[in-house]
Every structure is written in C-alpha cells, then in structure tokens.
C-alpha cells in the first residue's frame, strides 16, 4: 500500500505537521509513504499553452512538479493538506492541481481509482476548512479518484483543524482535530485495503 502526502502550505507549520502525522499513522499500519511540500519549491503556473495536449510528453515547464507527477503515478492513495487562505486552498496548491493537466493529457486515466483524502487547517474555527476540503475533493473527482471522508458525526468531508493561528503548536493541541484526522485516516485505510483486495 503506497500513500503520497502533499502539503500545500508555503510554511513548514500546521499543515506540514498534520500531513506528516497522517503519513506516520499509516506507516505504522504497514503503508509505504512519500511526502512532498510546496514550501520552497519552484512550481510555475499553468499557462494553458496546450503543450501537454499537443505533445503528450508532459509539461513545458521543467520544475519541481516532476516529483509530484512521479509520486502521483506511484501511489495507491493520495493525502492532500492545505491551510485555509481567503476561505479556500492556497495559491500554491491550486497551481499544483492545475499543473496535473500535463500527466492527464498524456493518459486521461492515469489517476483513475486512486483513493484521495483531504486535510484543511484554519486559523479560525469556521475559517473555510470545509470549502477547502471540497476544492480538494473536486480535484479528486475530476481526475476519477475516489474521495473519502471520515463518515458522519465529526469527519463528514475529511479532517479539519483549528490552529488558532498558532501554526504547528495550534494543530498539535487541537485534540478534536487529531481525533477527526484519525477517524478519516481509518476510513481511508479501509477503502485502500478494499481496493487492493486485502
């Protein structure tokens, strides 16, 4: 079972902690994990130049997205985390998602059937976490992936944290957020196992 975790935060704080917590939790269950953070990475905007459509050989930009493409193809499951910026995902994460067009142009079914899970960290209790989760779920659905939440009563769409604008410390101290993350991870793990016939 191979899981790729992506942190869509330009900082190595709350979202970085939450995604790594998730990967370590799954690693203890026997998963092989890989991690990518947009922090300090060069990821150019999609120009809609259609190079990827015409050439079918990836993106015209040769930057840190190459690592993302490789790991998305490698993974059985994908966990994407984001802090909430202006009520939604970060610009860096949106750019990463937009740039996935390049591998889909080469093979439209390349991500089909992979299991996807979302994590959102907000400085406010109701800062847009669920909107950010839905944006990530839209990415999963558009690319024929299987989005999972943690189920009713607390983790409907995925894992959310209230950091109180205290970065990693705020996430570490959000006991309800950690409970919801584990609940969502357990469902993610179950679906991955079912998909792999384990």
Curated annotation (Swiss-Prot):
Keywords: 4Fe-4S, Flavoprotein, FMN, Iron, Iron-sulfur, Metal-binding
Domain of life: Archaea
InterPro entries: Flavoprotein-like_sf, FMN_Rdtase-like_dom, ISF_SsuE-like
UniProt: [4Fe-4S] cluster binding residues: 46, 49, 52, 59
Cofactor(s) named in the record: FMN; [4Fe-4S] cluster
Cofactor note: Binds 1 FMN per subunit.
Pfam annotation, one family: FMN_red
Gene Ontology MF terms: 4 iron, 4 sulfur cluster binding; metal ion binding; oxidoreductase activity
Quaternary structure and interacting proteins, as annotated: Homodimer.
Family: Belongs to the SsuE family. Isf subfamily.
Reported function: Redox-active protein probably involved in electron transport.
Protein name: Iron-sulfur flavoprotein MJ0731
Species assigned in the record: Methanocaldococcus jannaschii (strain ATCC 43067 / DSM 2661 / JAL-1 / JCM 10045 / NBRC 100440)
């Amino acid at each position: 079972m191979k899981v790729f975790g992506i942190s869509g935060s330009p900082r190595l704080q709350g979202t970085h902690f939450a995604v790594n917590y998730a990967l370590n939790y799954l690693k203890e269950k026997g998963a092989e994990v890989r991690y990518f953070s947009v922090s300090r990475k060069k990821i150019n905007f999609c120009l809609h130049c259609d190079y990827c459509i015409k050439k079918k050989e990836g993106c015209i930009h040769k930057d840190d997205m190459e690592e993302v493409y490789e790991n998305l193809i490698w993974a059985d499951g994908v966990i994407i985390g984001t802090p909430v910026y202006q009520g939604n995902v970060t610009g860096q994460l949106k750019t990463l998602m937009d740039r996935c067009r390049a591998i889909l142009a080469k093979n439209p079914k390349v991500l089909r059937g992979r299991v996807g899970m979302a994590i959102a960290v907000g400085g406010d209790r109701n800062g847009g976490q669920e909107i950010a989760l839905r944006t990530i779920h839209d990415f999963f659905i558009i690319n024929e992936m299987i989005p999972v939440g943690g189920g009713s009563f607390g983790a409907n769409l995925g894992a959310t944290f209230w950091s109180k604008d205290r970065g990693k410390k705020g996430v570490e101290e959000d006991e309800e957020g950690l409970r919801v993350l584990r609940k969502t991870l357990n469902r993610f793990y179950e679906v991955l196992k079912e998909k792999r016939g384990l």
